């Protein structure tokens, strides 16, 4: 299997600590969500940022492969840390809310969103592990 990309991140101190990537492009304090102060982030925000970016890249690619131009996709990804009825530890769930310009029908937009979900590496990694809700709105 060919590796397309590899990166490393190191954390010291867990959810009340610090995380940095090997190239230091990301070098930031980590705090639990309840202690958010606007100067640090938390694992859920990092996951949301990575997944939203990856998913929107996949969505844009699928649209272009299907000759949909000027759709200008935008993806907002919500990560929730919620009770797990089967465990004492919490679980994650995700909502993916995409918006595209009115260049295709709602039905086509939903089809391409599903195709992006099947293509996106983050979606593949979470498949069967967390609940993921998909939504797309076609706007003027």
Swiss-Prot record:
SUPFAM superfamilies: OsmC-like. GO terms for biological process: response to oxidative stress. InterPro entries: KH_dom-like_a/b, OHR, OsmC/Ohr_fam, OsmC/Ohrsf. It comes from the Bacteria. Belongs to the OsmC/Ohr family. This is Organic hydroperoxide resistance protein-like. It comes from Staphylococcus aureus (strain bovine RF122 / ET3-1).
